[in-house]
From Swiss-Prot:
InterPro entries: AspA/AstE_fam (IPR050178), AstE_AspA_cat (IPR055438), Aste_AspA_hybrid_dom (IPR007036), SuccinylGlu_desuccinylase (IPR016681). It catalyses: N-succinyl-L-glutamate + H2O = L-glutamate + succinate. Belongs to the AspA/AstE family. Succinylglutamate desuccinylase subfamily. Pathway: Amino-acid degradation; L-arginine degradation via AST pathway; L-glutamate and succinate from L-arginine: step 5/5. Keywords: Arginine metabolism, Hydrolase, Metal-binding, Zinc. The lineage of its organism: Bacteria, Pseudomonadati, Pseudomonadota, Gammaproteobacteria, Alteromonadales. This is Succinylglutamate desuccinylase. Pfam families: AstE_AspA_cat (PF24827), AstE_AspA_hybrid (PF04952). Binds 1 zinc ion per subunit. Zn(2+) binds at H63, E66, H160. GO terms for biological process: arginine catabolic process to glutamate; arginine catabolic process to succinate. Transforms N(2)-succinylglutamate into succinate and glutamate. Its cofactor is Zn(2+). The active site is at E224.
């Protein structure tokens, strides 16, 4: 495996050729500047001999059909392996769900991004590939963050693409973080990366980014980079700014960020999440409605169990509507403009 990676510099290809696991860990050096450690299929660490104090996790492919972030991360990995760029910050790349990537599907059995913070081991337990993999990914993040001294900045960008069109093509979800202000610097980094819209979540979740935020105090985000397309069919010119800013972050080049300015970004507050309680749950709007579509107060968003679910605020925007989820799961996130967010 080591020789195959050294020859091809294509970590994604190696991962997809061995989607369940590698035979064992291996490591090697790039020149006299970087140690590379491969911990498992889809798990590669770049450890600079001299680093600048940030610990960065870039994860992709938690959903197997969300291919643009996978191609973006593989491009960065290849540039690092080719020594076209040199890491100055510790960086962990995670290709989340290789089995689903090979299958060309969002999941194999279950939505992995609902299985973190230990949810993978709650009943029924480790009964499918997503649950097993989520537990392993948690362990790799823990190992990465906790094997160095405290006091370093921890960052985790969990990269996705959405199943539907969006009023805002690229947007990020800022996990719930009670007692901690939101980072204006991080929001402006995202804006410079082409991600000009941020949603502030209002409650704990079992997503990958919430896990890193809550457990390790990381500046963590779920980042949606556009729409789902098959592997190789993404217009990667739409990710030039994202690639550039991630490259600057990893190589410790100046980020040249603007000071936080709420007028330069779109900020939303999650006002509620609507879960499914009955099999007859249905939305009243078209199935192909775009993310961030706004509806006025009193509008009937959905019906289930003989009851209507109406817009409660003057206007509410919807993201990720999906009526076909299992009972108990989220059908949609409702948003209002964020006017008093604690951003510093």
């Amino acid at each position: 495996m080591l020789q195959a990676l050294l020859d091809s510099k294509d970590f994604l290809a190696l991962t997809l050729a061995h989607p369940e696991q590698f035979d064992g860990e291996f490591s090697f050096n790039l020149g006299d500047h970087t140690q590379v450690e491969v911990w498992d299929t889809g798990v590669i660490v770049f450890e600079p001999i001299q680093n600048e104090g940030k610990d960065i996790v870039l994860s992709c492919g938690v959903h197997g059909n969300e291919t643009a972030p996978i191609e973006l991360c593989n491009s960065l990995i290849k540039q690092l392996l080719q020594q076209k760029i040199i890491a100055k910050q510790r960086t962990l790349f995670l290709i989340g769900n290789p089995l689903a990537i090979n299958n060309g599907t969002r999941i194999i059995d279950e939505n992995m991004n609902r299985l973190f913070s230990g949810e993978h081991s709650n009943p029924p337990g480790l009964v499918n590939p997503e649950r097993v993999r989520a537990k392993k990914l948690e362990a790799y993040v823990d190992r990465f963050y906790t094997t160095v001294a405290d006091g370093r900045q921890r960052i985790h960008y969990d990269l996705h693409t959405a199943m539907r069109a969006s009023k805002h093509e690229k947007f990020a979800i800022y996990p719930y973080r009670p007692g901690r202000a939101f980072s204006g610097e991080q929001i402006m980094f995202l804006a410079a990366s082409g991600v000009d819209t941020v949603l502030f979540h209002h409650e704990p979740t079992t997503t990958f980014s919430y896990f890193s935020s809550e457990r390790y105090g990381a500046d963590a985000f779920t980042i949606e980079l556009g729409k789902v397309y098959p592997m190789g069919q993404n217009d990667m010119t739409r990710f030039i700014a994202t690639h550039e800013m991630f490259m600057r972050l990893i190589t410790a080049k100046p980020l040249e960020l603007d000071a936080f300015d709420a007028d330069k970004v779109n900020l939303y507050q999650v006002c509620r999440v609507i879960n499914k309680h009955f099999d007859d749950f249905e939305f009243t709007f078209a199935t192909d409605v775009e993310n961030f579509r706004s509806f006025p107060k009193g509008f009937v968003l959905a019906r289930e169990g003989g009851k209507e679910i109406k817009v409660e605020h003057e206007f509410e925007s919807v993201v990720f509507p999906n009526a076909k989820v299992p009972i108990g799961n989220r059908t949609v996130i409702c948003l209002i403009p964020a006017v008093n967010a604690d951003v510093r």
